[in-house]
Amino acid sequence: MTSSPFSNPQFTLGIVGGGQLGKMLLAAARRMDIAVAVLDPASDAPAQYGAHRFERGALTDYTTVLNFGRQCQSVVLEIEAVNADALIQLEAEGIPCFPPGSVLQILQNKARQKAFFAEFGLPTAPFTVYESIEALHADRAAGAWPLPFVWKAATGGYDGFGVTLVRTEEQAQALPDGECLAEALVDLDLEVAVQVARTRSGETAVFPVTDMDFHPTANQVEFVVVPTRLPPASAAAAQELALKLVESLGLVGLLSVEFFVDRSGNLWINEAAPRPHNSGHWTLEACATSQFEQLVRAACDLPLGGTQAHAAAAMANVVGAEGHQGPVHYEGALDVLSQPGVHLHLYGKRETRPFRKMGHLTAVAETADEARKRAAAGRDALRVVTLPH
């Protein structure tokens, strides 16, 4: 049976994960009148609203994911923490998954990611994988990994969690147990990202390079800005490396690749995620095709869309204010919406907590500097709080 919704009236696109990325994928699919089913463990998952079918269930449970996928003609992910074996079985039964389960097995584990980069000659910072924190401590006692270094949990990290820049022995001794890796610090000048889409027929589309500025304490993306500050040759090199990674993996769907740029201008692949990414949200307002629509197109055997930016843009995350946890209230939303060129996206999460991603805003302008100023003004006008009882 064809996997195109325009030739199969029974076509349903399955989205595994019902958070904000799932919600934006749902919107892209519904705009083309594609039926969507959503799987998520939370009863208040943002992506449940507007879905043709919503199912509650654990994303890491083999049977749950398998049975959900069997009711779909194509399956996409909004999160890596999904049972990859279920995806492999779905593919064996003729249901394409984006990404394939075999690719997910690599990318959902940072240690496997780094090993893959090294195996295929892709530039990445020097690293060592450890099965436990005790093994890392033993290696350090023998002289390896003097301070400072970067510690990463092999699994379970997101939005800055599971990554620590270790500067003191106290920090080193407080690291949690589990499979992990130690990584050398890059003499960092800039962090950038690239999204690449690839169809089952091998068609590819590469998005413009975006700059990422991080919050100094939350380790979350604070601003994403396009066009990049990188010289054109360096930006083209980042796009080529991202494309090489996609093709080396045999990935179909969407891959978001994060890079470090050192002070000598060298590019180092940091991490890759086989799904839409925070660094690509700007594409909703300022690109010919959004990252979400592009993944929907790839998963539905549709031609990929154009990736040219039609304006400068800056995206700022809307996160929970420190000291506030509970039912969410948005202070200053009207002020944000009154600003020219600023687009506000709220994800539908009912509860806020410090630094939780509750939404984002994107500012478009003629220049990157102006877009960033607008995004900063919008972010500063909005506070994500709880109301006093």
Predicted feature descriptions by range:
Residues M1-A115, E134:
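ATP-binding N-terminal substructure of ATP-dependent carboxylate-amine bond-forming enzymes
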Residues G162-S264:
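Internal nucleotide-binding/catalytic subdomain
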